C-alpha cells in the first residue's frame, strides 16, 4: 500500500516523463534508493501514448482538471517551526486549446465496444461522452512489458521476455491506462474471433478501400497508440547511444523511417538523401545528382573547410545555399527535407550542422537517419522506469505530492509530504516543471507547441508498398508563422489499426494549434464524406478524425527563473518542439552528474551471474510475481535491432 512506503530515500523523482525516467534509472543503477511517483494514472506525463479510448479518457480528465481544483491542507499541520513549505500544483496547465473533430461515418450502435473490453463502450460523437464510456474499459487493462528487440522473427524465448517492470503500489496496477501493449493482450486470442487479430505486416494491396466508420475506430481502439509528443530518434543521436550503452534497448523495438518527403507547389514527393537514392532518383537530372552529391560531401566535412562558409556566417542558410550552384529544386530539398531548418531564421552554421547530423545518421540502421519505437514514444520513459525498478526503484502512480519541506536554516529541501500526509525524507528531489506552482513559476516565460493528431484512410504519397513510415516538412508561408513537421505512421508501427494511418503534425505555436496547423491539414487531406467514400478517384487521403491541442514547451528555461528553489531540487522540462530527443538526454545527464558527480551515467547492467545480493541492502528486491510480462503475439517481423554495428557517435 502507498501508506506503507519507506520514509527515507536518496532520491525522490516526481513525474515520469522521459528526462525524469532516465535520471531515475541512472540513480537507481548507481546504487541510490529511488522513489518515483506521479500523480497521473499513467507513465510518461506529456511523453505518454494512449489507445484511442485512453486518449478520450485523457481528454475528459483534462476537462475535469480545468473545472475542479481540490485543496488538501493536511500537509500544513506537519510543517515545523524551523521549516517552510513549497506547495506543489494540483492542476496541470500544460495542455490548452483542445479541439476534437470526427469526420468518419458515425453509425453508432448500442453494442459497439472496444475489442477486448470488459465493459461495453457506448461510443458517442463527442470526445467527452466517448471518454466516459471508454474509461471503465481502458483503466481495467494493464499495459504489458516491452520485450527484447528482435528482427526477422516475432518468436521470443520465454526467458528473454521476462523483463522486470516497475514495482508499484496497488494504485499502479489498476491505473496504467496508456494502452501500450493492449494491442497484443493475450486475451485477444481467446475472447475474440481470429479475424479480429490481423497480422501486422501485410504489404498486399487491398482491391477496394472499405468504408471506415467511427464505430470501427472505437472497436479497434487498442490498435492505436497515440503519442502526445511526436518525435523520432536519430540513429546516431544521444538517446540511441544511451539505449545501447545502458542495454535498455532490450526493452523496446524500433522501425525505420522509410521515406523523407517534401511538399512543394502543392505536391508531395520523395526526397533522395542517401547516395543510392540520389543516383537512382528519376526526379533529378544527372547534373543535379552531381551537384547534390558534391554539396552533401562538403557538408559532412564542413568544419575542416571554414574558408568555404566563413563569409556567410552572418547570413541565413537559405541565402548561403543560393551561392552554392544548386538548382532551386535542390535548395528546397536540402533546406526543408535534409537540414529541416527555417528559411528565415536559421543561420549558415546551424544549417550546415543540421545537414551533417542528418548525413552522419544515414546507413546505421537503414536508408534514412531516423527510427521510431514500436507502440509509440510513450514506450521510452517506461523502458527507463523498468531499468530503475530492476535495481530497486519503487513506483507509485496516482500518488500526488502536496509540498516540498524546506529547512529554514540550510535552505535545503529535506522531505516531501504526500497525499496521505506521509513525510518522506530524501537527499535529492527531481521534479517535472508542470508540478511547480504558479508562485514558483511566476517569472517563467513559456513557449507553446502546436500539435495535431489525425487518423486517415491513406498515405499522403501512395506507393506500391502501403507500410511506409514517412516524415514531411511543410515550410512556413506567412511572416511570424513556423514550418510544420508531419510524421505519418502506418499500422506496422503498432500505432493504428490496419487500413488507417496515424499522422502527427507539430510546430512552434504562434496561435492556437488549430489556427497554426489547419492550413496544412487542408492541403494534405480531404475531410471524409459519404459521397467521397464511394468515389475511388479521390486524390488526397481522407481525414477520419482530428485532435488539436497546444502543449507547454518548458525546455531551455534557466533555473534562476524559478522562485526560491532549494539547491537540492532539480527541475526537468517537458517535451520540446525539436525532432529528436537529445535535449531530454542532455538534461538528464547534467542533473545526474550534479547528484552523483563521480558515477558513470547509465552503465550497462552487470552479468546476472556476477550479481551478489546484499541481505542488508535497503534497496527493495522486485518480487518475481510482479515482473513477468505478458508476451506480445503481434510483434512485427520487420523491426530493427539496436546493436552496435559501429562505435556510437560522441
Swiss-Prot record:
Origin species: Rattus norvegicus
Gene Ontology cellular-component terms listed: cytosol; nucleus; Rab-protein geranylgeranyltransferase complex
Coiled-coil stretches noted in the UniProt entry, renumbered to this chain: none
Sequence similarity: Belongs to the Rab GDI family.
GO aspect biological process, one term: intracellular protein transport
Job of this protein: Substrate-binding subunit of the Rab geranylgeranyltransferase (GGTase) complex. Binds unprenylated Rab proteins and presents the substrate peptide to the catalytic component B composed of RABGGTA and RABGGTB, and remains bound to it after the geranylgeranyl transfer reaction. The component A is thought to be regenerated by transferring its prenylated Rab back to the donor membrane.
Subcellular compartments: Cytoplasm, Cytosol
Subunit-level organization: Monomer. Heterotrimer composed of RABGGTA, RABGGTB and CHM; within this trimer, RABGGTA and RABGGTB form the catalytic component B, while CHM (component A) mediates Rab protein binding. Can associate with the Rab GGTase dimer (RGGT or component B) prior to Rab protein binding; the association is stabilized by geranylgeranyl pyrophosphate (GGpp). The CHM:RGGT:Rab complex is destabilized by GGpp. Interacts with RAB1A, RAB1B, RAB7A and RAB27A and mediates their prenylation. Interacts with RAB5A.
Keywords: Cytoplasm, GTPase activation
The protein's name in its UniProt record: Rab proteins geranylgeranyltransferase component A 1
Expression across tissues: Most abundant in the heart, brain, and spleen. Lower levels seen in the lung, liver, muscle and kidney. Extremely low levels seen in the testis.
Biased composition range(s): Basic and acidic residues: 177-190
Database matches in SUPFAM superfamilies: FAD-linked reductases, C-terminal domain (SSF54373), FAD/NAD(P)-binding domain (SSF51905)
Any Pfam family the entry gives: RAE1_2_domI_C
GO molecular function: GDP-dissociation inhibitor activity; GTPase activator activity; protein-containing complex binding; small GTPase binding
The organism's taxonomic lineage, starting at the top: Eukaryota, Metazoa, Chordata, Craniata, Vertebrata
Region Disordered: start-end pairs: 156-208, 603-650
Bias kind Polar residues: ranges: 616-634
